[in-house]
Amino acid sequence: MALSGLGSGPEGNPNNHQGKAIPTLNPSHGQGPSFLFSWVSFLVPFWSWYPFSPLPLKGIPGENSSSPNGLKNFHGIGLNGTERGMGHFHPISGNRLGLRLTLVAGWFLEPFPTFLAVLIRTQGDSTPSRSFVAFFVGTLGLGQEGITGSFNRKIAGPATIDPQDWAMEEGVLTNFLWPPFTTFFRTTKGFPVQWHGEGSFVVPGIFSLPQPLPWWLLLPDTPTGAGKPPESRQHQPSHSMNGAIVDIPGGLTQTPSSPDRSSSTNSIADEEKKLDYKPTSPTSDTEKGESLPLTASQSEIIASPTFSEMIRVIFSGPTLVLGACYFCTFGAELSINSVLGTFYQRQLGLGLQNAGNLAAIFGLLNIVMRPLGGMASDLLYRKTGSVWSKKALLHTYCVMTGVFCIAIGLARSRSQATLVGLVSGGLAFFLEGANGLTYSHVHPYANGVVSGFTGACGNLGGIVFAIVFRYNSLDYSKVFWIIGAIIIGLQVATCWIKPVPKSVI
């Protein structure tokens, strides 16, 4: 991917209108709007969800009298709601209704339970608000789905990692800005006492209100899938998938003639090598952007799966590996983010603002560490040409995440330099890098099912690890090494699974 592509409009594939470069600095051309609004759509909903978790003890007066265990129960409610939302929205978007309509519907409803947080007075009041916010925030992963539908699979990895990076900075927004918001409502005359903490939820709610408009008014549906626009379909007049999931590249009965057949063959061989696939017949040239008279690239068409096909995809070995790894990394990130400020307060004796500033560093490093993970994966793949090498790197990152969790838990350090170094240095590097590595393995042909399952596993990990924090609320150091042991154990259990399904070989 050339740097010149960052500011220019990307070349598009005429068969499916997918961009072949990332127009990071040119959001007005080609797939630029899709890229821009995808990461914004990840950030703003998560910003509504996130403040419930890390700062309730100091931020919401109605919850100040709650027990720490009760607060962690509500954190679990939030994670469970997000998991349910992702499980519903991803398959609907990727395989049935289409991305645009699903996003517009979810985002239209999401601000209302966010505004309901202003009415929180007791623990019971926070339950419906937290649950419904979390459910609609399940749309946050659809930004990733929009990327894989709008860009060529060769750049789907970096195109997906960048938006998730920037969107995860909502943790930084919360830790840096929530204490000042709370202070503003507390010190400004005219605001009732109950607004001192809950009033801050008005801010992400206001930002959420205009979210559906760009997708509804400016953007088409994703170029592939059930909701693809007419101009994409007209290039594929005779395609009929009969509702079945299409296999990744296989033999085709007809291929176009080309004066430069040798270069096309070399390109095909490179793509086949990525899947460790040995062809028995010619393969499509769609990846080169050449028009095909009778068929399209099988690997880039998203079909509506039957229930049995969805089950087969979910329980395939590679999908389970993705789910297990994301369970470890994203689950750990969610749960650790929710207690990190409190952990720093206890271990280092800091106030709310200073502890929040240090905790924000962990989230801020997402913007660097996730791309580094994806870049390391790409570099290793170029050197080896084997998908196994990418899988081995993913497991290595996950194991090192577990090692640093165990180190933090056993060290019980009260030195600010040591503790912040372990958390924001070693742990952030491997944990957030592993999050970037995970999504580079998602197969586009079953995008909605695979990404929905993987995202749900990440939230399930957050629930499980939050439960561990809940039952060890007085000893967070112990929880760190327990989480580390779980992560390492899951890597040992899944490291032997092949990265490519047998049906594709």
Curated annotation (Swiss-Prot):
GO terms for molecular function: nitrate transmembrane transporter activity. The keyword Transmembrane helix applies. It is a multi-pass membrane protein. GO terms for cellular component: plasma membrane. Residues 1-25, 221-295 are annotated as: Disordered. It holds the Pfam family MFS_1. Gene3D superfamilies: MFS general substrate transporter like domains. Glycans are attached at N64, N80. InterPro entries: MFS, MFS_trans_sf, NO3_transporter. Induction: Expression is induced by the presence of the cluster-specific polyketide synthase PKS1. Expression is up-regulated in the presence of large amounts of glucose, during nitrogen starvation or at alkaline pH, conditions highly conducive to elsinochrome accumulation. Its main location: membrane. It is found in: Cell membrane. Residues 1-10 have a biased composition (Gly residues). The chain crosses the membrane at residues 35-55, 313-333, 348-368, 391-411, 417-437, 449-469, 479-499. Residues 255-267 have a biased composition (Low complexity). Keywords: Cell membrane, Glycoprotein, Membrane, Transmembrane, Transmembrane helix, Transport. Belongs to the major facilitator superfamily. Nitrate/nitrite porter (TC 2.A.1.8) family. Major facilitator-type transporter; part of the gene cluster that mediates the biosynthesis of elsinochromes, pigments consisting of at least four interconvertible tautomers (A, B, C and D) that have a core phenolic quinone to which various side chains are attached and which play an important role in fungal pathogenesis. Once elsinochrome is synthesized, it must be exported outside the fungal cells, which is probably accomplished by the ECT1 transporter, to avoid toxicity. This is Elsinochrome transporter 1. The gene is ECT1.
